[in-house]
């Protein structure tokens, strides 16, 4: 926020800058793409997951790091390459099981980004203990109810909320 002082009336006026809005929209697009991929994997829809992942890969390349907060920028520098690689892997695969494997790494990096960025609504970090040969896997959701993207209808409600990010 920028504080502007008016010499006319002596009152301070607080005016939000466009940079804050641009920053939010950059990351909002990436989060929206992520949630769309998750929803497609819940439905075991490899085609829609691939399409949404392609959109996400484009949005990742378009991020202007100079408009991110310091914390977001630091996290972005660590996760951007893997985010792009995971999104590309999902977009190029027609096999939902391979997409789910790539989604696991995508989710780890999106978690780091979610922790660093300010979300307009709570985001739930959820966990499935069964995926990855019993090693487990996490994902982000806008809903607290479990809808497992790693198994879809086979084990739709397998998992739990491990953290709420506000």
Identify what each model region corresponds to:
Residues 1-16:
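Bacterial Sec-dependent N-terminal signal peptides
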């Amino acid at each position: 926020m920028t504080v502007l002082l008016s010499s006319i009336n002596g009152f301070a006026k607080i005016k939000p800058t466009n940079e804050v809005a641009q920053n939010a929209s950059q990351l909002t697009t990436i989060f929206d793409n992520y949630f769309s991929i998750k929803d497609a994997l819940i439905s075991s829809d490899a085609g829609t997951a691939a399409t949404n992942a392609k959109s996400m890969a484009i949005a990742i390349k378009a991020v202007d790091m100079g408009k991110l907060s310091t914390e977001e920028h630091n996290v972005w520098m660590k996760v951007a390459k893997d985010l792009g690689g995971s999104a590309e892997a999902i977009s190029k695969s027609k096999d939902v099981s391979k997409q789910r494997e790539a989604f696991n790494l995508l989710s780890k990096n999106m978690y780091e980004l979610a922790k660093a960025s300010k979300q307009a609504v709570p985001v739930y970090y959820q966990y499935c203990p069964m995926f990855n040969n019993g090693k487990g896997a996490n994902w982000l959701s806008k809903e607290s109810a479990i809808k497992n993207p790693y198994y879809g209808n086979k084990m739709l409600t397998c998992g739990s909320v491990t953290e709420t990010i506000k």
